[in-house]
Swiss-Prot record:
Its EC number is 3.1.1.4. The lineage of its organism: Eukaryota, Metazoa, Chordata, Craniata, Vertebrata. Snake venom phospholipase A2 (PLA2) that displays edema-inducing activities, as well as presynaptic neurotoxicity and low myotoxicity. PLA2 catalyzes the calcium-dependent hydrolysis of the 2-acyl groups in 3-sn-phosphoglycerides. Its main location: secreted. It is found in: Secreted. GO terms for biological process: arachidonate secretion; lipid catabolic process; negative regulation of T cell proliferation; phospholipid metabolic process. It comes from Sistrurus tergeminus. Expressed by the venom gland. It holds the Pfam family Phospholip_A2_1. PANTHER family: PHOSPHOLIPASE A2 FAMILY MEMBER, PHOSPHOLIPASE A2, MEMBRANE ASSOCIATED. This is Basic phospholipase A2 Sct-N6. GO terms for cellular component: extracellular region. Ca(2+) binds at Y43, G45, G47, D64.
Length: 138
């Protein structure tokens, strides 16, 4: 069920930030966000609970925390400006909210890239009912 909602949200929001986040992930990991990160572990995808399963899942936990810190922003739909220079993502634009969203997405994409060696296929489409450990706080 969680996977269905993730795909539905991603399809509805393709004009917005989620498509941009997918592109950043592709740049940093050479993987498509769907299916690689759309329902990975306890935090990648819609919602999150429990303890992150590994370093990749922790990237998603930190990304969720980053979004939570944004006030008066719409991180799942706002579009932002960014460029790529020598393999480095540069967030741009004059809107502070959109720039912060971009920085959250950039940090997660970089984190995914840095943790490719520990990525575990067994955590793809991980059922959230198995995320029973006490949740961490941001």
């Amino acid at each position: 069920m969680r996977t269905f909602w993730i795909v539905a949200v991603l399809l509805v929001g393709v004009e917005g930030n989620l498509l941009q986040f997918n592109k950043m992930i592709k740049i940093m990991t050479k993987k498509n966000a769907i299916p690689s990160y759309s329902s990975y572990g306890c935090y990648c995808g819609w919602g999150g609970r429990g303890r992150p399963k590994d370093a990749t899942d922790r990237c998603c936990f930190v990304h969720d925390c980053c979004y939570e810190k944004l006030t008066d922003c719409s991180p799942k739909t706002d579009t932002y400006s960014y460029s790529l220079k020598s393999g480095v993502i540069i967030c741009g634009g004059n809107d502070p909210c959109k720039k912060q969203i971009c920085e959250c997405d950039k940090a997660a994409a970089v984190c995914f890239g840095e943790n490719l060696s520990t990525y575990k296929k067994r955590y793809m489409f991980y059922p959230d009912f198995l995320c029973t450990d006490p949740s961490e706080t941001c």
